[in-house]
Regions:
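Conserved catalytic cores of phosphodiester-cleaving nucleases, focusing on short active-site segments
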Residues: 17, 36-38, 42-56
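Non-catalytic C-terminal interaction segments of nucleic acid-processing enzymes
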Residues: 19, 39-42, 75, 83-136
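Acidic-basic catalytic patches of nuclease active cores, encompassing PD-(D/E)XK
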Residues: 1-28
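A general structural detector for well-ordered alpha-helical segments in enzyme core domains, enriched
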Residues: 13, 66-69
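Active-site-adjacent loop/helix micro-motif of nuclease/hydrolase catalytic cores
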Residues: 54-67
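Arginine/glycine-rich "motif VI" loop of SF2 helicases in the C-terminal RecA-like domain
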Residues: 70-74
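Short acidic/glycine-enriched loop/turn segments that link adjacent beta-strands
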Residues: 30-33, 86-87
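Structural beta-sheet core signal
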Residues: 47, 79-81
């Protein structure tokens, strides 16, 4: 998948959330550690990382590095995951400390075929708010 397709998908998610009362701006074109920034429907400052998966897993993976970088921001850190069974929104600041696992992952999902071991969290989907927007 090309980087342009990735950005189109991210912008579509942002647009759908904005229709539901969010006020987000896509910023995934640069070197930020998140894909959107803005406010929640209740006016909270937020940063949003967006991922989609072609396969369904009941545990949603996020790299520890990405998780930690999101929490460093002066805003609520959110993680949006879309997969064939639904759309999940994790409020990362509210999650209890998770255990890390080491997984053999792509170095960079879109631009290389290299793989290496990465520390990751596997977030149980029951910890997320399941959203009813349909993007497939």
């Amino acid at each position: 998948m090309s980087i342009n397709k990735v950005h189109q998908f991210e912008k579509a998610i942002v647009a759908l959330l904005n229709l539901d009362g969010w006020n987000l701006e896509h910023c995934g074109n640069g070197f930020e550690h998140f894909d959107a920034i803005g406010t929640s429907p209740k006016g909270k400052q937020v940063v949003l990382e967006i991922k989609w998966r072609k396969k369904y897993y009941d545990k949603k993976m996020i790299e520890k590095y990405k998780f930690d970088k999101l929490l460093e921001e002066d805003a609520e850190a959110l993680y949006f995951v879309a997969d064939p069974k639904g759309n999940y929104l994790f409020w990362l600041n509210d999650l209890a400390k998770q255990e890390t696992v080491e997984l053999y992952c792509p170095d960079t999902t879109l631009w290389t075929k290299k793989r290496n071991n990465k520390e990751c969290y596997l977030l149980d989907e029951r910890l997320a708010h399941k959203l009813n927007i349909n993007i497939y």
